[in-house]
């Protein structure tokens, strides 16, 4: 079940999740407004996704902390690794960073604290953890998400290579990103190089609305 944090009445203050919109999304919003109008379904579809609404500042009775409390607990004598969640025996969610190119309104990642980005050493340790018993006995797939992992493609190479070396039990690596729909220019040779000679790597585009599937996004 979803984890719901009940706040004392005095603490029912809204979370400040700042508006963050890429220049490319700003241009797209302007184009849709000029072409269809500010209150049109075409413009609102994108604006509701990224433009901060004043109602977000109103107090609320409860807040959803996460979809599920699935963070991995480590023994007291071990140093815990950030960004690991496990929902099922055969799969694991890895969040190498909580940074994104743009902030989707009402994203539950806003409630994840503290914010972090894994170091190269931590990425290698994550791969070793996934490749060691008893975790490796059932783990066959990982989902790399965030945040958005493609905000740092140069760092992901370290994580992918670590899995190849230390976690051969992981047969599928899924990479979830909104970068193609938020800032398609970032899908350059540095990003594409991640997929070279990695047949077990799958890319998944996270989107809910057709307005984000622009020609540039589809090309990316």
What function would you assign to each model-found segment?
Residues 1-86:
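Flexible, acidic/Gly-rich N-terminal and inter-domain linker regions that tether
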Residues 10-11, 145-149:
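Conserved short loop/turn motifs at secondary-structure junctions
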Residues 80-83, 93-95, 128-129:
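Catalytic micro-motifs at enzyme active sites that drive phosphoryl/nucleotidyl and oxygen chemistry
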Residues 86-120, 175:
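Canonical Radical SAM [4Fe-4S] cluster-binding loop centered on the CxxxCxxC motif
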Residues 95, 143-145:
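Short glycine-rich or small-residue beta-strand-to-loop segments that form or flank ligand, phosphate
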Residues 103, 137-143:
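Glycine-rich, often proline-containing surface loops adjacent to acidic residues and nearby aromatics
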Residues 114, 149-150:
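Short strand->helix junction
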Residues 124-139, 150-220:
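Conserved AdoMet/S-adenosylmethionine-binding subsite of the radical SAM
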């Amino acid at each position: 079940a979803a984890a719901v944090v009940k706040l004392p009445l005095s603490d029912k203050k809204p979370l400040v999740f700042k508006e963050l919109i890429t220049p490319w999304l700003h241009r797209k919003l302007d184009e849709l407004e000029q072409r269809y109008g500010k209150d049109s379904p075409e413009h609102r579809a994108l604006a509701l996704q990224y433009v901060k609404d004043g109602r977000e500042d109103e107090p609320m009775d409860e807040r959803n902390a996460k979809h599920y409390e699935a963070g991995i607990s480590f023994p007291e004598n071990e140093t815990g690794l950030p960004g690991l969640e496990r929902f099922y025996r055969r799969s694991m969610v890895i969040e190498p960073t909580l940074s994104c190119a743009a902030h989707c309104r009402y994203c539950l990642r806003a409630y994840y604290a503290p914010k972090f980005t894994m170091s190269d050493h931590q990425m290698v340790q994550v791969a070793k953890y996934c490749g060691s018993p008893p975790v490796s006995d059932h783990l066959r797939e990982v989902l790399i998400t965030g945040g958005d992992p493609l905000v740092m493609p140069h760092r992901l190479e370290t994580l992918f290579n670590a899995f190849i070396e230390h976690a051969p039990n992981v047969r599928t690596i899924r990479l979830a990103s909104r970068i193609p729909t938020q800032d398609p220019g970032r899908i350059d040779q540095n990003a594409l190089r991640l997929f070279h000679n990695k047949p077990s790597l799958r890319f998944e585009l996270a989107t809910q609305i057709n307005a984000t599937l622009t020609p540039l996004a589809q090309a990316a």
